[in-house]
């Protein structure tokens, strides 16, 4: 109605001003929408609830639909694609690669094996490596990582004729949007080290908001 009133007066400068104000308003709304999406993502990133992944993804889908010409479209799409991949869980192989035994924890070179368990369920029991401070295992188990996956327990056991010695115990809680990264690192306990590695069956796309 305002445009129809102005047009007969040939008030081109005023129409230009209105157009510029509309563009500014829309940019501000887009900026606020993006900020809300990012804030929601950061608030949920350490979640242990898969529903948080779905809620974040829905928000980003709505942003991409509402602002198809956004300068941030590519970034938002990458975040959305990342959430799509992790929402249902990521299948891959969790491996116990190698270890380093603290010489102060045992009298002589240990005969050591490693177990990986989840609650009361043993997922992996490696072969025993004899007489070695630096055992190499290179054994793994297929798992599905999810944001709500229960903690994993890693133990290194020194086999002894009288009584086995527990040299190492580590509980790994791989929660949150990027919790899978916690399954590829060197874990430590009592001066001992164990290198573990998680290799997804399909690549997980980079997430710009987690860098």
Predicted regions and their residues:
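Peripheral membrane lipid-binding modules
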Residues: 103-191
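Compositionally biased low-complexity segments at domain edges in trafficked proteins
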Residues: 184-211
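Alpha-helical linker/edge segments of TPR/alpha-solenoid repeat scaffolds
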Residues: 21-43, 80-91
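C2/C2-like lipid-binding beta-sandwich modules
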Residues: 81-113, 202-211
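Short solvent-exposed coil/turn linkers within tandem alpha-helical repeat scaffolds
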Residues: 2-25, 50, 61-79, 131, ...
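Short coil/turn connectors between adjacent alpha-helices in alpha-solenoid helical repeat scaffolds
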Residues: 43-52
């Amino acid at each position: 109605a305002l445009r129809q009133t102005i047009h007969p007066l040939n008030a081109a400068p005023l129409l230009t001003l209105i157009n510029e104000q509309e563009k500014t308003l829309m940019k501000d709304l887009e900026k606020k929408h993006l900020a809300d999406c990012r804030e929601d993502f950061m608030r949920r990133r350490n979640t242990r609830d898969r529903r948080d992944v779905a809620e974040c993804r829905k928000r980003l889908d709505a942003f991409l639909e509402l602002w198809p010409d956004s300068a941030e479209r590519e970034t938002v799409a990458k975040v959305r694609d990342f959430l799509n991949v992790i929402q249902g869980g990521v299948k891959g192989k969790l491996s116990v690669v190698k270890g380093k035994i603290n010489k102060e924890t045992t009298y002589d070179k240990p005969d050591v094996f490693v177990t990986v368990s989840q609650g009361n369920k043993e997922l992996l029991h490696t072969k025993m490596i004899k007489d070695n401070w630096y055992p190499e295992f290179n054994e793994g188990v297929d798992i599905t990582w999810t944001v709500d996956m229960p903690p994993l327990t890693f133990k290194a056991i020194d086999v002894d004729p009288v009584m086995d010695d527990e040299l190492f115990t580590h509980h790994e809680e791989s929660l949150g949007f990027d919790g899978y990264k916690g399954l590829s690192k060197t874990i430590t306990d009592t001066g001992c080290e164990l290198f573990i590695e998680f290799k997804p069956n399909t690549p997980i796309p980079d997430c710009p908001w987690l860098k």
